[in-house]
A protein has these predicted regions:
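Phosphate-binding/switch loop-helix module in NTP-utilizing enzymes
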Residues: 1-36
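A short beta-strand-to-loop transition that corresponds to the Sensor-1 phosphate-sensing loop
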Residues: 10, 46-51
């Protein structure tokens, strides 16, 4: 079975439709998505960021930092058109040490939580899936449960091995570059003398 998926990344970057403001343009694109879904059976994915105000001090005080429908930037009505709204949350970004049973201090910026914010088909609202995020290659993997110590240790070991490879690679690169520059300098001075 073939599936056709259209992904728009992101709604705020859409070029304005003639005579429309940003919010109206995003809303119109969302309506196009409904048509594509209903008439052509396409899967329409509209990526939409949270408003900057959502990360403000007041929301931090109230602990309202997770993505929400009412926190969407530029056009909040797109959630009415969606079968499912999913949010990605980084507790590390807000300095949390623990979240949903996971030690954020160990994962640092390598953990995200995918939460179903709205679901009109299956009733999965509020379901959370912890994800390992490897930003170097832009991939996500589902994490083991927080009480599965062995599986989590394998993830920690993987992160440690990636960190040492990255450091070694960067270090090797710098040494090679310095050697080449030193070699050029020696040749230049030999020629100049």
């Amino acid at each position: 079975e073939e599936r056709r998926i259209i992904i728009i990344d992101n709604a705020s970057n859409l070029s304005l439709e003639s005579g429309l403001k940003k919010m109206e343009t995003i809303d119109k694109m969302s309506k196009y998505g409904i048509t594509l879904r209903n008439q052509l059976k396409f899967i329409f994915v509209l990526i939409q960021h949270q408003a900057q105000a959502q990360e403000g001090i007041e929301n931090q005080k109230l602990n309202k930092l997770k993505p929400s429908s009412d926190g969407l930037a530029d056009c909040k009505t797109t959630t009415r058109d969606a079968n499912m709204v999913i949010g990605l949350y980084s507790p590390f970004k807000y300095g949390l040490r623990e979240y949903e049973g996971y030690d954020i201090t160990k994962f640092r910026n390598h953990i995200r939580f995918m939460e179903v914010i709205e679901d009109r088909d299956y009733g999965a609202n509020g379901q959370i899936c912890p994800l390992f995020f490897d930003g170097a290659v832009s991939t996500f993997y589902e994490l083991p449960r927080p009480d599965d110590r062995e599986a989590l240790q394998r993830v920690y070991n993987y992160m440690e091995s990636r960190k040492s490879k990255t450091a070694k690679t960067f270090f090797s690169y710098r040494i090679n570059k310095m050697n080449k520059e030193l070699h050029r300098w020696k040749i230049f001075h030999k020629f100049a003398a």
